[in-house]
Amino acid sequence: MCAPLELVIIQLGTNDFQAPFGIRAWAAASGVGKLVEIVRHAPLEPGMPQPRILIVAPPEIVQPKGTNEKKFEGAVERSNGFAAALAEMAVAKSVHFFDLNPITSRSDIDGIHLDANQHDVIGKAAALVVHGLIVRSKNISDSMLHAK
């Protein structure tokens, strides 16, 4: 059983675009949608509320280079529209969505991973998003508790 969880964050999908899998954006987003359902149906302790869910869109894949070039051949094309597909999935599943594309990008070194400074950017931005979701929820819960 799951203990009380405030928020479950799902940021997946990049490896789905490896050449051997041949997966396109909508299929990868559907996989994330299935994970949302798994979280929603996980057994909870009695009286525990369902956790909120945040889907995070990873930065777009740029041209893979080096050792990742063959492994991710065609990934740029197959992943095209992934953030939009994840945003649609978030709406369909009534969960929160955060797109990393406006704030960060993949490394120029291999086109797949993130440089160290990008982890810092993402961490700071994610902390603000998560804080906002948790504080907003607590304020709503507190107001419900104090309603007369």
Each model region followed by its residue ranges:
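Alpha-helical cap/lid subdomain in secreted, periplasmic
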Residues: 1-148
